[in-house]
Amino acid sequence: MRKRTLVSVLFLFSLLFLLPDQGRKLHANAEESSDDVTDPPKVEEKIGGHGGLSTDSDVVHRESESMSKKTLRSNAEKFEFQAEVSRLMDIIINSLYSNKDIFLRELISNASDALDKIRFLALTDKDVLGEGDTAKLEIQIKLDKAKKILSIRDRGIGMTKEDLIKNLGTIAKSGTSAFVEKMQSSGDLNLIGQFGVGFYSAYLVADYIEVISKHNDDSQYVWESKANGKFAVSEDTWNEPLGRGTEIRLHLRDEAGEYLEESKLKELVKRYSEFINFPISLWASKEVETEVPVEEDESADEETETTSTEEEKEEDAEEEDGEKKQKTKKVKETVYEWELLNDVKAIWLRSPKEVTEEEYTKFYHSLSKDFTDEKPMAWSHFNAEGDVEFKAVLYVPPKAPHDLYESYYNSNKANLKLYVRRVFISDEFDELLPKYLSFLKGLVDSDTLPLNVSREMLQQHSSLKTIKKKLIRKALDMIRKLAEEDPDEIHDDEKKDVEKSGENDEKKGQYTKFWNEFGKSVKLGIIEDAANRNRLAKLLRFETTKSDGKLTSLDQYIKRMKKSQKDIFYITGSSKEQLEKSPFLERLIKKGYEVIFFTDPVDEYLMQYLMDYEDKKFQNVSKEGLKVGKDSKDKELKEAFKELTKWWKGNLASENVDDVKISNRLADTPCVVVTSKFGWSANMERIMQSQTLSDANKQAYMRGKRVLEINPRHPIIKELKDRIASDPEDESVKETAQLMYQTALIESGFILTDPKDFAARIYNSVKSGLNISPDAVADEEIEAAEEPETSEATETKSDDLAGGLNIEAEPVEQQEENTKDEL
């Protein structure tokens, strides 16, 4: 009985479905036979599933079959674009936009404009917002994979019929621009306009576009175009009323299928529109587990005949009594709901006093995509006012990227992002921060920055220069403040008070950490940025002969200078350990002078640009011109060693030695070699010789003249003076003088051009010390006679020979002995 009832019910349902289907077929046949496309009938069905474009609160109906053909409606008013479409599309596709992704940025930007407008009007008239869902200021994105439609909807001010014709039918005309002209004296409109062609970027991915819009002062209209030179506008009588706002439907090209993926849309919103003022939501899918009733298996009907009558009766009785408990099971089900995509708050719009440290840290991790637990070393949040207004947040990362300096001049670091009214513009340009500050991460949001027709190509405008100047100053102030707040940077006379207070414990050692990570960038800034050279010099840190392994600054160095000291002394080399043993420091250290150690290769270039600081000149102690006070015996010593210096200079004429002088920098070493004031130091020569593409001719020119300085108090120099006085032609004295010069070259950090000659002189000196004749040579090697063949082979041959001649073979040793006897 139950089986027959079920069959009857199914038959009735099939009849109900067949009747509407016949109606649809008749309607389709009528369309095919008609030359003109008729308006689609109004559809009352709500679409809330994955393929639909509506929800319970926001219902938009599917298109009719005629719309799927992407043809203009027959009853619509037809217009032609005022600009040639071929030229328009050429500008949009080929000239303005380097990638298709930004179409979504442009449409969301326009939606934000519309929301800004209605919000501004609502300040004086709250009724313009309406009620319910219409009053929500939001942007919604939906996709229909089956029909390849992407929809972007806003609840903004909307457009009238006239607005649609004027703003979307004319190139370089923007509703926002007109609105600004109308309201510019009423306050801050906070609009993103000025373009007029942003909407047309949608044709990069779509070949047919519908714009459905409803303004409070007009009916709902549809604008549609295939970008073939024509567009149409008609009153909308078939779509669900929007209430207020605009919906743009993009019928995507076949090659633009990637924009029907939820992940792609999320990525684009995250990249370009993350900080738009209004919520941006995507109708997204997700899997959830739900409990559903366990349905009877299809095989249950087949097994009914075999079940016992008693079981059927019992089952019927249970059903009648309602005592049967329904079984359920868990299944995975795909559901759709609105997912908020821009949940990161734009903290730079708030006052810095209102933002907590935790919020700054969280925003840094979101901005930099660095999701470690490390906090940024420092940050600067500020608002700039004046001719160019902008807001910015700058961060010093906790660590430097491993490849920060590997491709310094060729890299395009995406660390500073430019926004215009919360719309992402670009992160690949050098107009806002110089290369040496490229390690900073942050964001700049300008309200007044003028742009050209494309958001991707910034104009070379004075506004950019103004922003850059302010950003650099704020960045340097942030780094300077980091140093000032570090207890390790405080002078000794102030340390006791700080230690007692116990403040800034978290900031202890922070600037040392910064210097170890980014110190080279400060040095590069001194080289590249002449305008801020003095500010950057204050940020320099280095070790000295008196810093006990700690970093010190130029200001601290000057505070410790001797009263008679006029110059800032420094020395360059490959390591601190090497420099501490340098002969150039001997007399300076004994007299209590402090010398700066520069051990980074970039320091050589740095000191070519940093000539002075606070009216103090820099003096490389390995170059000529060092002044360390006057010695009362200087004139007397010069006169006493005049003959030696003159003789020595003559003997070194072939060695590119410009002069031989009495030294004022030596204490324990007999002599050193110094370079001319503007020539390369020994360390610079070493650096340049290691360059793969170095020019040998340029090296010879830049090497300059060398000066041999002798220590008149050293016993070797005194002895040479006496020897020269007695016999200036003594070959042994000449040999010793040459050896002394070569040794001084090595100790001064230079690389010998003829190490073989130097080695020969050393060996001769050793011979002399061991009382070995200078003419003594190594014994010649006695050439051994050619070794005979192996004994086994010889014995074998001897045995063969003996066997052949029937004689007894002699041992090999005996044969060799007999040969010697014969000789």
From Swiss-Prot:
Listed Basic and acidic residues bias regions: 39-48
First-listed, main subcellular location of the protein, grouped into a coarse class: endoplasmic reticulum
Keyword set includes ATP-binding: yes
Glycosylated residues, chain numbering: 110, 452, 620
Signal peptide: 1-23
PROSITE patterns xref list: ER_TARGET (PS00014), HSP90 (PS00298)
Protein name from the UniProt record: Endoplasmin homolog
GO CC annotation: chloroplast; cytosol; endoplasmic reticulum; endoplasmic reticulum lumen; mitochondrion; nucleus; plant-type vacuole; plasma membrane
Subunit structure: Interacts with FKBP42. Interacts with P23-1.
Gene: HSP90-7
Pfam families recorded: HATPase_c_3 (PF13589), HSP90 (PF00183)
GO biological process terms held by the UniProt record: protein secretion; regulation of meristem growth; regulation of meristem structural organization; response to endoplasmic reticulum stress; response to salt stress; response to water deprivation
Subcellular location(s) of the protein: Endoplasmic reticulum lumen
Residues with site note (Important for ATP hydrolysis): 455
PANTHER family to which the protein is assigned, alphabetical: HEAT SHOCK PROTEIN 90 FAMILY MEMBER
Ranges spanned by the short sequence motif Prevents secretion from ER, renumbered to the chain: 820-823
UniProt feature, compositional bias: Acidic residues: 290-321, 777-792
Induction statement: Seems inhibited by heat shock.
Keyword ATP-binding carried by entry: yes
Binding-site residues for ATP, renumbered to this chain: 106, 110, 154, 159, 167, 173-175, 194-199, 246
Recorded superkingdom: Eukaryota
The protein's role, per its UniProt record: May have a molecular chaperone role in the processing of secreted materials. Required for shoot apical meristem (SAM), root apical meristem (RAM) and floral meristem (FM) formation, probably by regulating the folding of CLAVATA proteins (CLVs). Also involved in pollen tube elongation. Involved in resistance to tunicamycin- or high calcium-induced ER stresses. Possesses ATPase activity.
Tissues where the protein occurs: Ubiquitous.
Family per similarity comment: Belongs to the heat shock protein 90 family.
UniProt GO molecular function: ATP binding; ATP hydrolysis activity; ATP-dependent protein folding chaperone; unfolded protein binding
Keywords annotated in UniProt: ATP-binding, Calcium, Chaperone, Endoplasmic reticulum, Glycoprotein, Nucleotide-binding, Signal, Stress response
